[in-house]
Amino acid sequence: MKLLNRISLVAIATIALFSCSSSEDQFIGTWTNECEDEVMGLKILPQKELLTLNDDNSFVQSFTYFADSQYDTLAVVSVNGSWELVNNCLEMSYDTESIVVKCDDEDIIDIFYDNLLGNIALNNEELEKAHEEDSQYGIQNATVKDNSLISKENLEDEDGEVIYTKVN
């Protein structure tokens, strides 16, 4: 059954590669729906986007991402709680603001999705700490273990300590 599930997910991922949405499908927030978005070598492909508007004008966003990187990680995640992880991804936890996917690799990768701002971030402890302490800033960070960054803009607190690094 596990093998069948994996085959199905790979098939869906393949379909996603050839069915990228147009810019008209962008949702409320800052996320830009592009066919292929490279973030620190991690390819994130939006496979499905749903926006459900509730009676009280709140909304539920549902996103599924296929992430394929040098770590050979394929993660299938949905913000609304319907999720499944394959390959070496072990667990996922989420709340109303973020998703954390922890992958069993020599480098632990956490994928944070800010449900309010629509930002993807890759990091581990420091980013998680920044999110816990200053969630008002959202998550706009991308680093890997060797701290190599594409281009960055630091947000510092009043003491000069870097709260997070925005990757452009």
Give the role of each language-model region.
Residues 1-18:
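Sec-dependent bacterial lipoprotein signal peptides
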